[in-house]
């Protein structure tokens, strides 16, 4: 049996592209510059972890000013409010009781920590994480990531192979007619037992066996990627003497542990590396039970050619763990040696990561109170991304999978041609991965930061303003808008790929279906497939040309109110905000879009008729697509589709709004009416510069979000309280504060305080634009403490 070549498949996670929306914010325009570090640039980050990390690091994550951030939190009125909550107070009282109870684990731990050497260790740990910490990976991490992805892809490939025949010949064992059958048995099933291996069983594998075999084959084909990734953690401390004392203590304790095992006699050593003292523990790869593991793998996967090379490689790899001090840094590392520590730029900052081009923006902002820095190198970004080369490898890999599936030889040829078309059409559209760097810092209102992405061939357009921000409703809970580059051939490319896939299935998949499945397939092809072509024509000739450009906006709001969401739910004494998601698109040709919209409505009617011809019973008798309700509003027209049969509030209706320069799709006509008329975006307005050329923009009103969520929390809590009291909830009832029991009232009071604390993060915004050949996201948030009680 032919098996697929174990290559790298294109299923990969995309590299980080910017900060998370919940932390977004904007600020002043910022342009990074290169060149040597000026004196004022060096001052803020001189001697920092970012400066001493080697310039070839694969990734970096650094946290600074953690003690200051911690002090800000625990010293806030918000934190004090949380501590006063009854549940928190009870938990603290219980902890204090356990802490002072003789013989309790907490009491024993506290007694242990009162020893002078342990107090020193605790103080050292607190100091280590107070001001500057980092973790980075050496280039070996790139190889390790590639290996992990290769193994994952081998597992996925194994799952795509199927066999029509079992591995064993079976015979049925009929039950003994004289054997008593349990009275409660509904029937007796014949038992199957294996009597012999199939003649070709040597070439057949069960799913688990096949997966193991393909993983081993992947290891054999990628021995160069089989490495121990070198990782380094660094912690800056002002307690050098305590650090040296604790290092000696670690060495003594480690010696006691290794003395119990003769194989580890030479594993523990003290070494001088990078100008510092390290205690190292080396686990010789040859001492690990690889032979035992190899036997288990061979039992599962059979004899895989080259598997011995994998074992030899594993035996040659040492695992080295070390902890030590270099100057005022506690360094911990895990890898195959300590050689990489010699690259730490303690003596020559020019050899550090901070001096490289991606960190030019950070160098320019080095005088700011930096709180965090993250970095992904271009090689690691490329390892994590899907590239055109991956699509090329996938052509061979999937073609081999087709061959392994037992399809005709022509199938492999046709599938290869189809995959090559996919590669040609979409490979040129894939981004070309580049380095990524971000950092954050304190500002007068909260946090602020930048993310710089040097990925090339991105599909975004940042040459103009995002005009559809004027059609987001003014003060939505959240909004995110992005402009994509125009790609007139994309629809035709997608249609061509889908048609090719359908043709392949028709030619090679249909003959493998049973008679009933063939009938369903033929009916689908006769009645519904032609409608797919009509849909493509409507999009190609009507909808897409009518849209102005590549802007796409997502809006979340909650201004429409209801007292009863559904007929079968009780009403609420207070109004409940309805969740209102919407999509907004720019419009260039209103008349053409309306023509395309009418064609879509007609196509929906054709689809219902086609489905009914396929199976008259699949739809309710007499069902037709509801006629939309047309309403004139300020700025345009709204078409809404009532859902009377669903029992939902009448305000919940799918709706389409068409204005002069925007189209809105929503679940509520009221929201469409608010959005269709142009109005300035007020959410986060004081922080933003959304009137500049941007590729993307987003804003979140955190306070408004929790204000909308709170009534629903109270409604659900009251519903649960009535359910507990009466055993059921009358749909005709109205839930109010009178329905709350004592437990519910206390829980809701806790929720109220927690929401007030969460609302101290008032708003977050982000702007994304192209600057200096990079996609730059600039974010800012506003944090306001609770008032003094």
Regions found by a protein language model. Name each.
Residues 311-397, 401, 649-731, 735-737:
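A conserved glycine-rich beta-strand in the N-terminal activation segment of trypsin-fold
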Residues 44, 260-319, 621-653:
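A cross-kingdom feature marking solvent-exposed beta-strand/loop segments within repeated
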Residues 59-61, 227-238, 322, 328-333, ...:
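Short cationic amphipathic helices and targeting signals
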Residues 1-16:
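N-terminal secretory signal peptides that target proteins for export/translocation
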Residues 39-41, 45, 50, 428-429, ...:
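Extended terminal
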Residues 33-39:
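Sec/Tat signal peptide C-region and signal peptidase I cleavage site
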Residues 17-32:
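Bacterial N-terminal signal peptides
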Residues 40-230, 234-294, 372-420, 453-578, ...:
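Structural boundary/hinge residues at secondary-structure and domain interfaces
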């Amino acid at each position: 049996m032919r098996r697929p070549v174990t290559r790298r498949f294109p299923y990969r996670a995309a590299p980080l592209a910017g900060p998370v929306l919940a932390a977004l914010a904007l600020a002043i325009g910022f342009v990074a510059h290169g060149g040597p570090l000026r004196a004022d640039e060096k001052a803020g980050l001189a001697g920092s972890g970012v400066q001493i990390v080697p310039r070839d690091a694969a990734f970096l994550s650094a946290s600074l000013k953690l003690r200051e951030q911690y002090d800000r939190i625990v010293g806030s009125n918000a934190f004090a409010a949380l501590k006063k909550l009854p549940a928190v107070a009870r938990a603290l009282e219980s902890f204090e009781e356990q802490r002072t109870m003789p013989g309790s684990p907490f009491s024993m731990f506290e007694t242990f920590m009162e020893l002078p050497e342990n107090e020193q260790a605790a103080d050292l740990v607190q100091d280590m994480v107070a001001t500057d910490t980092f973790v980075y990976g050496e280039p070996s991490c790139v190889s390790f990531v590639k290996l992990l992805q290769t193994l994952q892809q081998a597992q996925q490939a194994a799952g795509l192979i199927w066999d029509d025949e079992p591995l064993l010949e079976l015979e049925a064992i009929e039950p003994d007619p004289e054997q008593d059958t349990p009275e409660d048995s509904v029937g007796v099933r014949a038992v199957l037992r294996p009597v012999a291996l199939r003649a070709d069983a040597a070439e057949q594998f069960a799913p688990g066996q096949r997966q193991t075999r393909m993983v081993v084959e992947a290891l054999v084909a990628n021995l160069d990627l089989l490495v121990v990734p070198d990782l380094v953690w660094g912690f800056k401390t002002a307690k050098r003497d305590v650090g040296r004392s604790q290092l000696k203590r670690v060495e003594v304790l480690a010696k006691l542990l290794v003395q119990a095992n003769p194989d580890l006699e030479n594993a523990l050593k003290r070494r001088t590396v990078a100008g510092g003292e390290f205690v190292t523990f080396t686990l010789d790869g040859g001492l690990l039970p690889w032979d035992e593991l190899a036997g288990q793998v061979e039992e599962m996967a059979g004899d895989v050619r080259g598997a011995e090379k994998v074992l030899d490689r594993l035996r040659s790899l040492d695992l080295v763990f070390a902890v030590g001090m270099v100057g005022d840094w506690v360094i911990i590392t895990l890898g195959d040696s300590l050689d990489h520590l010699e690259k730490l730029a303690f003596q020559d900052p020019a050899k550090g990561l901070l001096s490289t081009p991606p960190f030019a923006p950070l160098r320019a902002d080095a005088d700011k109170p930096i709180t965090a820095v993250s970095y992904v190198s271009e090689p690691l970004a490329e390892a994590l991304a899907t590239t055109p080369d991956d699509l090329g490898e996938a052509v061979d890999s999937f073609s081999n999978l087709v061959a392994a599936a037992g399809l005709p030889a022509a199938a492999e040829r046709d599938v290869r041609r189809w995959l090559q078309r996919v590669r040609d059409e979409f490979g040129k559209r894939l981004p070309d991965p580049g380095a990524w760097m971000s950092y954050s810092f304190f500002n007068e209102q909260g946090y602020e930061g930048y993310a710089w992405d040097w990925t090339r061939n991105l599909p975004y357009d940042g040459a103009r303003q995002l005009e559809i921000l004027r059609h987001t409703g003014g003060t939505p809970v959240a909004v995110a808008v992005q402009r994509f580059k125009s790609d007139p051939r994309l629809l035709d490319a997608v249609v061509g790929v889908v048609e090719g896939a359908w043709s392949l299935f028709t030619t090679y998949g249909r003959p493998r279906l049973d008679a009933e499945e063939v009938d369903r397939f033929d009916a689908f092809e006769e009645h519904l497939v032609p409608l797919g072509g009509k849909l493509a024509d409507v999009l190609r000739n009507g909808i897409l040309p009518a849209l102005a450009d590549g802007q796409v906006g997502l809006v979340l709001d909650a201004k429409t109110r209801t007292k009863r969401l559904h007929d079968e739910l009780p009403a609420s004494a207070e109004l409940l905000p309805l969740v209102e998601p919407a999509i907004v698109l720019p419009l260039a040709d209103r008349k053409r879009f309306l023509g395309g919209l009418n064609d879509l409505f007609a196509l929906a009617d054709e689809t219902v008729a086609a489905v009914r011809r396929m199976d008259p019973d699949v739809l309710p008798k007499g069902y037709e697509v509801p006629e939309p309700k047309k309403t004139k509003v300020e700025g345009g027209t709204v078409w809404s589709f009532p859902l009377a049969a669903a029992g939902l509030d009448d305000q919940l209706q799918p709706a389409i709004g068409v204005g002069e320069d925007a189209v809105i799709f929503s679940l509520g006509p009221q929201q469409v009416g608010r959005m269709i008329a142009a109005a300035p975006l007020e959410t986060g307005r004081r922080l933003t510069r959304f009137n500049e050329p941007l590729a993307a923009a987003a804003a979140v009103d955190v306070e408004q979000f929790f204000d909308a969520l709170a009534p629903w929390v109270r409604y659900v809590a009251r519903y649960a309280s009535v359910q507990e009291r009466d055993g059921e909830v009358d749909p005709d009832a109205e839930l109010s504060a009178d329905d709350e029991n004592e437990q519910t009232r206390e829980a809701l009071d806790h929720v109220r305080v927690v929401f007030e604390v969460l609302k101290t993060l008032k708003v977050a915004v982000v702007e994304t634009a192209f600057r200096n050949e990079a996609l730059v996201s600039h974010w800012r948030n506003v944090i306001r403490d609770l008032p003094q009680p």
